[in-house]
Amino acid sequence: MDLISVLPSASKSCVCLHKPLSSSTHKLKPFCRTIRILGMPRPRKSVLMVSSMSISVNTLVSDDAVQRRTGGYHSNLWNDDVIQFLSTPYGELAYRERAERLIDEVRNIFNSMSLEDGEFSDLIIQRLWMVDNVERLGIDRHFKNEIKSALDYVYSYWSQKGIGCGTKSIITDLNSTALGFRTLRLHGYPVSADVLKHFRNQIGQFVSCPSETEEDIRSMVNLYRASLIAFPGEEVMEEAESFSEKYLKETLQKIPDCSLSREIGDVLEHGWHTNLPRFEARNYIDVFGQDTKNMESNRKTEKLLELAKLEFNIFQSIQKTELESLLRWWNDSGSPQITFTRHRHVEYYTLASCIAFEPQHSGFRLGFAKACHIITVLDDMYDLFGTVEELKLFTAAIKRWDPSATDCLPQYMKGIYMMVYNTVNEMSAEAQKAQGRDTLNYARQAWEVYLDSYVQEAKWIATGYLPTFEEYLENGKVSSGHRVSALQPMLTMDIPFPPHILKEVDFPSNLNDLACAILRLRGDTRCYQEDRARGEETSCISCYMKDNPGATEEDALNHLNVMISGVIKELNWELLKPDSSVPISSKKINFDITRAFHYGYKYRDGYSVSSVETKSLVMRTLLEPVPL
């Protein structure tokens, strides 16, 4: 199919001089041909009435007599007034100074861990407890050196059978070993999952202690948390996950409502791959503050809790300023006038804030929100609103990267084109400051390939073609938008991404491929029914059923869930594999973006229907301060 076709009444020429940066699978034919493109009036507005839990498809007839589909999405939940009238006192100097004093006090706690009541103490579990808690409370960025020193100490006593509470412990214990294994693996230490085999019985099964003390229960909590950091082929980790999950669910039915039961509930519900660091910190602050054992047995932990609360609230004052900037961009870009799309810029900003809440990463947070908003607009335009011919024109215009290319576009596309053009250029300028080199052409190539994948899907929809599962997934990994959502925001960070590192994090790396696969697979399992109602038959589910005659939707979903589980383990390996030439810190942000998207699809399409879990995330981490 020609990407550009000559319209019947051609009389006016549209000349575009620039050449595309990339040639993708879906080749563009020369754009410089005589085409008459009349500016299309903006379509008449339609009033879409939907409940917060459902999505309907609407068809409207625009002023050009073209029938266009809209998704029936609910409107923006966060108008300007909600954001502009946010107030917080935690930006004041007094709070920051108090936080700095607490940081010094907590650092002293780290440094004094070798002394207890004036005498030498070699408790390994004490060091692990401290590291684990500052990470779960979201304050670990202040203690990188102290954390490394503590974990180096723990690892120096690590054995094939694990560790005990202290260096002189003759018998290893499950709680120390499970927590130690998890923490060491997450920090890149080469620890084998085989260490858990020593906690199985003679017939190779994990067993629980009949006493079921709090210590026994915490051992199972840490075993479950450890089991989620599995690599491919680690059967003992699968066994540990199955056993500990069953144990914890049964335990919840027995114990009273308390801090431990809340901790178990949070761990079971959010695991690791959908437990965003700032969201985890907000939930754990409540749990940690209610744990009377922590507060009474060691008053030093009060410092941890106070610092965590202050840090959380101080960051909200930063978020308010950034949100005001994001709203200005959203309004200035003409986004409010794009009536056919979902407006989820505040939700996307919240996701970014939950995975990168260091103050200096403002460029990442704003860039991610802007990139995701653009991706959403393009997704709705290519999937629903635009005609195939219009979409071909838009894709070709993007490849020319010249504002004059808008002369060739329908009226409703002109503003969208300029939003993409200006924002990508602005993010490239930010990336150049951070990375010391021009990355615009590199970013443009990513956007071109991304739009090519959309054109392919638009052709499938227009012709009613149902591809094979493999064909669909390969294209779908690109059209998921993961790469373009991550690339430019990532480059604005204070993390070096020289070319040899970037190719191991971005395309064509296995890390990027797996991240894109998870987003496509999980997204399809949550969206396929609504997409079908909108006339989009193509999904992982339908393609799998085509390839496997007789397979039901349930069969397809089961297959995809097994695939997702395997991809997650592979992604764990790509992030944490020992002796990698790429630092974990360079890979972590792309990995965490995967976690953010995974969170949005945990129960439903949380981007189309953002009025449930996603709304709660905004309220908990963005709008509501923690009581001091």
Swiss-Prot record:
<protein>
    <recommendedName>
        <fullName>(-)-beta-pinene synthase 1, chloroplastic</fullName>
        <ecNumber>4.2.3.120</ecNumber>
        <ecNumber>4.2.3.119</ecNumber>
    </recommendedName>
</protein>
<dbReference type="InterPro" id="IPR005630">
    <property type="entry name" value="Terpene_synthase_metal-bd"/>
</dbReference>
<dbReference type="GO" id="GO:0018867">
    <property type="term" value="P:alpha-pinene metabolic process"/>
</dbReference>
<comment type="function">
    <text>Monoterpene synthase (TPS) involved in the biosynthesis of monoterpene natural products included in conifer oleoresin secretions and volatile emissions; these compounds contribute to biotic and abiotic stress defense against herbivores and pathogens. Catalyzes the conversion of (2E)-geranyl diphosphate (GPP) to (-)-beta-pinene and, to a lower extent, to (-)-alpha-pinene.</text>
</comment>
<dbReference type="Pfam" id="PF03936">
    <property type="entry name" value="Terpene_synth_C"/>
</dbReference>
<keyword id="KW-0456">Lyase</keyword>
<comment type="similarity">
    <text>Belongs to the terpene synthase family. Tpsd subfamily.</text>
</comment>
<feature type="short sequence motif" description="DDXXD motif">
    <location>
        <begin position="379"/>
        <end position="383"/>
    </location>
</feature>
<dbReference type="InterPro" id="IPR034741">
    <property type="entry name" value="Terpene_cyclase-like_1_C"/>
</dbReference>
<dbReference type="InterPro" id="IPR036965">
    <property type="entry name" value="Terpene_synth_N_sf"/>
</dbReference>
<dbReference type="InterPro" id="IPR050148">
    <property type="entry name" value="Terpene_synthase-like"/>
</dbReference>
<dbReference type="GO" id="GO:0016102">
    <property type="term" value="P:diterpenoid biosynthetic process"/>
</dbReference>
<feature type="binding site">
    <location>
        <position position="531"/>
    </location>
    <ligand>
        <name>Mg(2+) 3</name>
    </ligand>
</feature>
<dbReference type="InterPro" id="IPR008930">
    <property type="entry name" value="Terpenoid_cyclase/PrenylTrfase"/>
</dbReference>
<dbReference type="InterPro" id="IPR044814">
    <property type="entry name" value="Terpene_cyclase_plant_C1"/>
</dbReference>
<comment type="pathway">
    <text>Terpene metabolism; oleoresin biosynthesis.</text>
</comment>
<keyword id="KW-0150">Chloroplast</keyword>
<feature type="binding site">
    <location>
        <position position="383"/>
    </location>
    <ligand>
        <name>Mg(2+) 2</name>
    </ligand>
</feature>
<comment type="pathway">
    <text>Secondary metabolite biosynthesis; terpenoid biosynthesis.</text>
</comment>
<dbReference type="GO" id="GO:0010333">
    <property type="term" value="F:terpene synthase activity"/>
</dbReference>
<dbReference type="InterPro" id="IPR001906">
    <property type="entry name" value="Terpene_synth_N"/>
</dbReference>
<feature type="transit peptide" description="Chloroplast">
    <location>
        <begin position="1"/>
        <end position="51"/>
    </location>
</feature>
<keyword id="KW-0934">Plastid</keyword>
<dbReference type="Pfam" id="PF01397">
    <property type="entry name" value="Terpene_synth"/>
</dbReference>
<keyword id="KW-0460">Magnesium</keyword>
<feature type="binding site">
    <location>
        <position position="379"/>
    </location>
    <ligand>
        <name>Mg(2+) 1</name>
    </ligand>
</feature>
<dbReference type="GO" id="GO:0050550">
    <property type="term" value="F:pinene synthase activity"/>
</dbReference>
<dbReference type="GO" id="GO:0009507">
    <property type="term" value="C:chloroplast"/>
</dbReference>
<dbReference type="InterPro" id="IPR008949">
    <property type="entry name" value="Isoprenoid_synthase_dom_sf"/>
</dbReference>
<keyword id="KW-0479">Metal-binding</keyword>
<keyword id="KW-0809">Transit peptide</keyword>
<dbReference type="GO" id="GO:0000287">
    <property type="term" value="F:magnesium ion binding"/>
</dbReference>
<dbReference type="GO" id="GO:0010597">
    <property type="term" value="P:green leaf volatile biosynthetic process"/>
</dbReference>
<feature type="binding site">
    <location>
        <position position="383"/>
    </location>
    <ligand>
        <name>Mg(2+) 1</name>
    </ligand>
</feature>
<dbReference type="GO" id="GO:0016114">
    <property type="term" value="P:terpenoid biosynthetic process"/>
</dbReference>
<feature type="binding site">
    <location>
        <position position="379"/>
    </location>
    <ligand>
        <name>Mg(2+) 2</name>
    </ligand>
</feature>
